[in-house]
């Protein structure tokens, strides 16, 4: 459940791996608004960081939010010993904050099972592409991804997309 939630949240919010791993479930989740806050913290013991010392908010769908609430409820005992949403659930390091290496290992195992090569950053690209299909403005996608420049966002959406070229022209006109 933890891994599915992590993947769902990354695909749905466009958050970077470090941003997801840095979520403190007691401070960063607004249960009334179904949002997750991204905060830059130097103190994260798993070295997870929000890039560019930024702060922003990501909205979760009803489905993912319900999954999140169930995950917290099902894992309350192990989460009580940690402020992090995502922790190691087994082994000698049980209860410690999940780190990037663990996520890469999990995705590698998933890739072997499914024959689909996956990487955390691909989920950010997926987020950007899906939001574009939904008609999001280029600047809104840029903001959601935490990009400073719209040119970076454009790279996430592919270079030969005519709709993207039109959107870029509109953005700069």
Question: What are the residue ranges of the model-derived segments?
Answer:
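Conserved catalytic core of the tyrosine transesterase superfamily
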Residues: 1-173
């Amino acid at each position: 459940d933890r891994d599915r939630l992590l993947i769902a949240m990354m695909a749905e919010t466009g958050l970077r791996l470090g941003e997801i791993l840095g979520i403190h479930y007691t401070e960063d989740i607004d249960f009334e608004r179904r949002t997750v806050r991204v905060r830059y913290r130097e103190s994260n013991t798993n070295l997870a960081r929000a890039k560019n010392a930024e702060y922003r908010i990501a909205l979760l769908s009803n489905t993912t939010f319900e999954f999140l609430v169930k995950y917290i409820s099902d894992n309350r005992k192990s989460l009580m010993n940690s402020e992090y949403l995502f922790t190691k659930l087994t082994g000698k390091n049980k209860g410690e904050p999940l780190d990037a290496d663990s996520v890469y290992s999990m995705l590698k195992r998933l890739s072997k099972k499914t024959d689909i090569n996956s990487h955390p950053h691909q989920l950010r690209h997926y987020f950007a592409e899906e939001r574009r299909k939904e008609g999001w403005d280029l600047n809104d996608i840029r903001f959601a991804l935490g990009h400073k420049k719209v040119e970076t966002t454009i790279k996430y959406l592919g270079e030969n997309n005519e709709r993207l070229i039109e959107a870029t022209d509109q953005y700069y006109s």
